[in-house]
Curated annotation (Swiss-Prot):
Name recorded for this polypeptide: Small ribosomal subunit biogenesis GTPase RsgA
Species annotation: Phocaeicola vulgatus (strain ATCC 8482 / DSM 1447 / JCM 5826 / CCUG 4940 / NBRC 14291 / NCTC 11154)
Family listed: Belongs to the TRAFAC class YlqF/YawG GTPase family. RsgA subfamily.
Cofactor(s) listed in the protein's UniProt record: Zn(2+)
Cofactor binding remark: Binds 1 zinc ion per subunit.
UniProt keyword list: Cytoplasm, GTP-binding, Hydrolase, Metal-binding, Nucleotide-binding, Ribosome biogenesis, RNA-binding, rRNA-binding, Zinc
Membrane-spanning intervals of the chain: none
UniProt xrefs under PROSITE patterns: ENGC_GTPASE, G_CP
Cellular component aspect of the GO annotation: cytoplasm
Amino-acid positions noted as binding GTP in the UniProt annotation, renumbered to this chain: 126-129, 180-188
A Pfam family reported for this protein in Swiss-Prot or TrEMBL: RsgA_GTPase
SUPFAM superfamilies, per database record: Nucleic acid-binding proteins, P-loop containing nucleoside triphosphate hydrolases
EC top class, as a word: hydrolase
Amino acid sequence: MKGLVIKNTGSWYLVKTEDGRTIECKIKGNFRLKGIRSTNPIAVGDYVQIIINNEGTAFISEIEDRKNYIIRRASNLSKQSHILAANLDQCMLIVTINYPETSTIFIDRFLATAEAYRVPVKLIFNKTDRYNEDDTRYMDALINLYTYIGYPCFKVSALNNIGTDEVKKDLEGKVTLLSGNSGVGKSTLINAILPEQTLKTGEISDYHNKGMHTTTFSEMFPVDGGGYIIDTPGIKGFGTFDMEEEEVGHYFKEIFEYSAHCKYGNCTHRHEPGCAVRDAVEKHLISESRYTSYLNMLEDKEEGKYRAAY
C-alpha cells in the first residue's frame, strides 16, 4: 500500500494512503537509507510503501525514490544528518531583523544547502510591524541583495495579516517547506494562511532574545487551491553536512559566477593570487556579508563548528 508521510513524531509516522486514510506507522529497527547517515531515515514528504501485520500494526517497508530533499547536520550528533523534508517544490525561509535577529550567516548557510540539493528558496521577512527606521532600512538592503542574487522576497507581518495573501498565492500547487530560526513567527504565519490549523505560538526568551520551539514535530498541511506546507521545528543553528570545501563556492551563485575568472582552477578565494572573487568583493560586486558567510562555511570541518547558533 502506497502513502505519503504527513507527520513525523520521531517514533511514529502518520501516512496518508492513496485511498484517503491516515495510518500511524512504525519503521523496523533495521530500516536504513543507503548512502545517507541520518537521524531520521524517513522524512515528511516521503512516499512510502506500508504493510500491516496480523496484529494490525502498520510498518513502513520501503521508501520511494526522492525528487529531492534538504538536509542539515544533526544538532546533537556531529557525524549524522537530519533530513528536514523530502520531495519539495520550494522552501520558504522566514527571516526577522529583530525579535529575534536572523543572521546573514544563517540565511546563507540555508541558501547554500538548498542550492546543493536543488531546492528553490524564497525569503519571507516577517514582523515588519515591529521594526524602527534603522531596522526597516537594513531589511530593505537585505531584500535588495537577495533579490539581485536571485532569491525572491516577501515583506510580511503575519500577526497583522499584512502581506500574507501574496505568500498564500505563491504556495498554491506546490509542496513548500517553511523553515527559520526559533521565534521568527512560523506558526503565526501558518495560522494566518491556514486559520483552521490554529497552531500554538510562543514567546521570545528575554535572556537570549531567541525563540522557543512551539512546533515539536514535522507536519504537512494541505493548502487551499492545492499543494502542501511542511512545518518543521524552529532551528537555532544550521550546520552543513557532507559539503566538501571545494564545493562550497558552487552554492553561492555570485561567487560561482566570478570564480570562472580566477587564475587558478582550485582557488579557494581566501589568499590565492589572481582571485577574481576577492577582487569582486573589494569592488563591492559581491556582498561582504555573503563572502563572510562563504568563509565561515569553509571552516565547518572544525570540530563542533556546527553547534554555533548561526
